[in-house]
């Protein structure tokens, strides 16, 4: 991941590499990154070692930027803007694929009412077994739990073909205004459906509400829009036929939770 800065939106700095593993500087290694800001002074990042197709032990990491410095969740300084990139080894390990032997992929990050980070990601025990997971910083440690199994990949693989994007989950999105809830897409009775899952005990238990039911076409990649501060929350998702990111006939639907 790289970034560039500007003070006027017209002139931009030369790009800088933000994070990089020592000894793994090849251009083909690409950590996946999700970002959220408090809109004031801090930017929060969650990221992986790379693409799960290429990283059988893909892990989930976290760091925060504020006032020219980079920190772990407990406030330990791990880098400076003038001394980039930040190393994976110095960042928080939220989920350790080396310990479990199961690869992961990041999906979303949000901040709770105390400004602490909450992360949604998938654990991928196999190509046909995707698990939605939820991690949040309690102020003292990372609480990391599974939400629910999600099924297999969501692209509709043609008969007789092997699926190239077998780690493409149905998708999960945190409700930014209240990240104790997520929207996700999982396989129900042979079809991908959208559901809202909520916890009232920091992930120890979950309840869910079906947004779509008994669908004839897939419903995938839910997104809960950022910046909406109303009492109700929205979710948008893709529905239709999807074979590949170059071959699809889909539309976007929206649901308002009242």
Feature-to-residue mapping (PLM):
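Extracellular, repeat-based ectodomains that mediate carbohydrate processing or recognition
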Residues: 1-258
């Amino acid at each position: 991941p790289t970034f560039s800065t500007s003070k006027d939106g017209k002139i931009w700095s030369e790009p800088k590499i933000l994070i990089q593993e020592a000894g793994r500087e090849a251009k083909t290694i690409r950590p996946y990154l999700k970002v959220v800001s408090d809109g004031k002074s801090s930017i929060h990042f969650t990221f992986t070692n790379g693409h799960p197709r290429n990283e059988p032990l893909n892990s989930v990491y976290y760091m925060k930027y504020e006032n020219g410095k980079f920190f772990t969740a407990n406030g330990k300084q791990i880098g400076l803007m003038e001394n980039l990139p930040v190393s994976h080894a110095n960042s928080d390990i939220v989920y350790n694929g080396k310990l479990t032997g199961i690869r992961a992929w990041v999906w979303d990050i949000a901040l709770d009412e105390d400004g602490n980070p909450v992360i949604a990601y998938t654990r991928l025990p196999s190509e046909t077994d995707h698990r939605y997971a939820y991690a949040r910083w309690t102020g003292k440690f990372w609480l990391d739990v599974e939400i629910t199994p999600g099924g297999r990949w969501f692209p509709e693989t043609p008969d007789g073909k092997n699926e190239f994007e077998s780690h493409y989950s149905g998708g999960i999105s945190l409700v930014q205004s209240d990240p104790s809830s997520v929207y996700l897409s999982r396989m129900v009775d042979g079809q991908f459906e959208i559901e809202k899952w909520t916890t009232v005990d920091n992930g120890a238990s979950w309840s869910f509400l079906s947004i779509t039911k008994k669908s004839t076409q897939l419903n995938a990649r839910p997104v809960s829009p950022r910046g909406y501060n109303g009492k109700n929350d929205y979710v948008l998702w893709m529905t239709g036929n999807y074979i590949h990111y170059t071959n699809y006939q889909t539309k976007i639907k929206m649901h308002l939770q009242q």
